[in-house]
Amino acid sequence: MATYAVGDIQGCYRALKLLLKKVKFNADNDHLWVAGDLVNRGPESLKSLRYIKKLGPSATLVLGNHDLHLLAHAYGVRTLNPKDTLAPILTAKDSDELLEWLQAQPLLHYDAEFDAVLVHAGIPPIWSIENALNYALEVEQALSTTQTAAAFFVDMYGNQPDVWQPSLEGTARLRLITNYLTRMRFCSPTGKLELQTKNAPSLPPTGFAPWYTHKHNKWGNTKILFGHWAALMGETRSKQFIGLDTGCVWGGALTMMRLEDGQFFAVDCPC
């Protein structure tokens, strides 16, 4: 029995199947963590979504920004742009079932056995792990009914507010929580977000640094596994912060880590 954590699949179903074959993944005994962005940009988002859903309790998915983007489309808040590859999901015969399942997935997962967190983008240095779990739950509760989810998606998009205040309320609070957990790359020591820059951490915008490089006494030794940042190519220079996005959909590789021993596995992406 083994637990594997995989980076951004983004509709690259063939690469996912090749990687699972490489590690001899057995859904009856093994467990797969998916670091968000299961869909979009790649050619087989529908197959990817169906497969992870079919794994049932053998898979744990946290939502990424592209997954939320799909749900926003489904609620009529956004229209598809030429780069999106989501139309086959929205028109599939099992679309409602797939989207209902996706909407019920968490934004953050903590496993006490491994003392490890799975999140799409990261956790701001001003939050503890407990804070992050509780704040993620606020968004998950907003997604828990059709009425509250519709209101959430209407106001989800935007870069403001860009720094955390416990007094934040309503849609502004939920938007910032979502941006931290699903979009963050660079932030300041006080958690101020910079969401425009997507390049490698060696070229940070002035006053900002990769979120995981700031002082984080509240996290102890908890490992944080994340995706989202393809430009990192998995290099965080830390054993505590595990970057899993190695740019599969951009011609890189699909990467996973076995949590029991920290061993990495990868396949070139035929996406």
UniProtKB/Swiss-Prot annotation:
One Gene Ontology molecular-function label:
bis(5'-nucleosyl)-tetraphosphatase (symmetrical) activity
Q: Which domain of life is it from?
A: Bacteria
Keyword list, A-Z: Hydrolase
Give the reactions, separated by semicolons, that this protein catalyses. Answer: P(1),P(4)-bis(5'-adenosyl) tetraphosphate + H2O = 2 ADP + 2 H(+)
Question: What Enzyme Commission number(s) apply to this enzyme?
Answer: 3.6.1.41
Annotated function: Hydrolyzes diadenosine 5',5'''-P1,P4-tetraphosphate to yield ADP.
Q: Which family does it belong to?
A: Belongs to the Ap4A hydrolase family.
Q: What is this protein called?
A: Bis(5'-nucleosyl)-tetraphosphatase, symmetrical
| Species per Swiss-Prot/TrEMBL record | Saccharophagus degradans (strain 2-40 / ATCC 43961 / DSM 17024)
Its ancestry begins with: Bacteria, Pseudomonadati, Pseudomonadota, Gammaproteobacteria, Cellvibrionales
